[in-house]
From Swiss-Prot:
The keyword NAD applies. It is an enzyme of class 7 (translocase). The gene is MT-ND3. GO terms for cellular component: mitochondrial inner membrane; NADH dehydrogenase complex. It comes from the Eukaryota. It comes from Scotinomys teguina. This is NADH-ubiquinone oxidoreductase chain 3. GO terms for molecular function: NADH dehydrogenase (ubiquinone) activity. GO terms for biological process: mitochondrial electron transport, NADH to ubiquinone. Disulfide bonds: none annotated.
Amino acid sequence: MNLIMVISINIILSSILILVAFWLPQLNSYTEKANPYECGFDPMSSARLPFSMKFFLVAITFLLFDLEIALLLPIPWAIQTYNINTMLLAAFILVSILALGLAYEWKQKGLEWTE
């Protein structure tokens, strides 16, 4: 019963904070919020230039392999379980999927900067 109360209070408080975070900025809108800020100087060029897709791909690749490390770090503790074959199979499948994704990105020349 206490666990349900704690979880429900956390959900309610989180929902209230999210709603307030979305609602408050809309109350005080003025044109200076939409203008780019460049260290107090007038902007040299438009701040709304298109973003290079290469940076985005590198960031996504970093996040994927960061996730892989986060999922593989608990394996030494998971080896102490009774069903070690299932755990090792799951880890092997995870690494295989990520390796296939890396090979595909490499084949599509997503990791090359020169064009």
